[in-house]
Amino acid sequence: MAGAIIENMSTRKLCIVGGILLVFQVIAFLVGGLIAPSPTTAVPYMSVKCIDVRKNHHKTKWLMPWGPNHCEKLKDFDEAVSRQIEANDIVFAVHIPLPSKEMSPWFQFMLFIMQLDIAFKMDNDLKENAEITLDVSLAYRDDMFNDWEEIAHAIEIRKLKCTFGSPKTLESEGRHYDCDFLPFMEIGSVAHKYYLINIRLPVNERKGINVGIGEVKDIRLVGIHQNGGFTKVWFAMKTFLTPSILIIMVWYWRRITLMTRAPVLLEKVIFALGISMTFINIPVEWFSIGFDWTWMLLFGDIRQGIFYAMLLSFWIIFCGEHMMDQNERNRLSGYWKQVGPIAVGSFCLFIFDMCERGVQLKNPFYSIWTTEVGTELAMAFIIVAGICLCLYFLFLCFMVFQVFRNISGKQSSLPAMSKARRLHYEGLIFRFKFLMLITLACAAMTVIFFIVSQVTEGHWKWGDITIQVNSAFFTGIYGMWNLYVFALMFLYAPSHKNYGEDQSNGDLGVSSGEELQLTTTITHVDGPTEVYKLARKEAQE
């Protein structure tokens, strides 16, 4: 008889393999917790109010908040009123990064959110459901003396969601509203050293532009970028894991091709899972250090989506191949009800991502959540994907229940066997249940560490040792799924250990009648695994 390596491996060897994988798992968490810094850094920026003295030439002039060529500044809007400076001549300028610092390609991306300081005034109150129109421009340069080069310019509208905690009376004038943060900008690469943002709030009373938005005192931005130290650790992990998964994948497929039969469906799915994991691992991000690849965030989302779709499909097919009879097994079309929700949900999330980050490739200030239509469209895609995910897990839970029920039903036949044969089949059942529990543990660890990373301060301090929880989450979970795929391809590769007729029926002390009672008629030595044979007879009956 021949089957998977896990079915011919002794418990001692299986424990050794599990121990080695556990050591690598601990190392993956420690790399993020002890070596890598926090994954991201948030930097607050206060805009500087500049006077655009060159009227009607807004698009040809960049206003710097500081430096040798800084703009003419306004202290506050009272000064603007006293000097009779109109709102259309005021520009909010933000230089990135702060003085004496430089941006780096190791930061990988920049995400900005906006906070408006809006004061209450009786004659300029903030209307309900007010919208603010922003005329925003983004430029870059790589030297303090070079001219600014435009990256993007757009007219964007943001909805204001503000509350006022005091009565709206004369005594409350000057107090600020409590406004929600607004999405402002996202760029998928940091290829330049210096960036400049100019923000205008154009006013047109006839068209109702920026009317009824209250008295905007200041504009604050919070910039979030990936830490360079974390990026280097992340790239190093990808560089190390890529050949590891690639080698085991080649080894796995070579063992399959050496068999005299065609690959079965489960073997193909495991191989496809290895390909999708390799697709994630390949460190193409190294090229982003030298090239301005703004599409890397979108590309990363697509890679992760392919992997998770394959992982969910594998779990369904893994359970199904241990439950279905010979006529239904080994055909992908037999799983259309279970795999269909995965495909629909993945497609919805892909469309949503293209509507958000796909558009941001041309307009980094765009956000699908800023309009009623965009919000409804985004929510529709997310809700459909959520429904598909729920359907998937219902199918998966039902199939897992069916498999365990079938195997439990066959366990009643085990006492009638010889001791050696009974121990053999008990080992097969244990190994199947073991993989199911490991899968559950991996999923649970992913959820637990995600929750912990959200509710903690980002790091734990034990004496002189600081553990970066968020970094440990990223590196640990990333390493865990790599080890999971590695273990699948190693343990479920075809075993070349064959028992002769005398050995299989003599040494194990089993009669031919006993063999026929527990398995279907499989005469080929390269046939399905033993757990398939054991579980499938229940379905046939």
Swiss-Prot record:
Keywords: Cytoplasmic vesicle, Developmental protein, Golgi apparatus, Membrane, Signal, Transmembrane, Transmembrane helix, Wnt signaling pathway. The keyword Iron-sulfur does not apply. GO terms for biological process: intracellular protein transport; positive regulation of Wnt protein secretion; positive regulation of Wnt signaling pathway; Wnt protein secretion; Wnt signaling pathway. Residues 1-42 form the signal peptide. Residues 43-232, 290-303, 353-380, 453-471 are lumenal. It is a multi-pass membrane protein. The keyword ATP-binding does not apply. This is Protein wntless homolog. It comes from Gallus gallus (Chicken). The lineage of its organism: Eukaryota, Metazoa, Chordata, Craniata, Vertebrata. The gene is WLS.
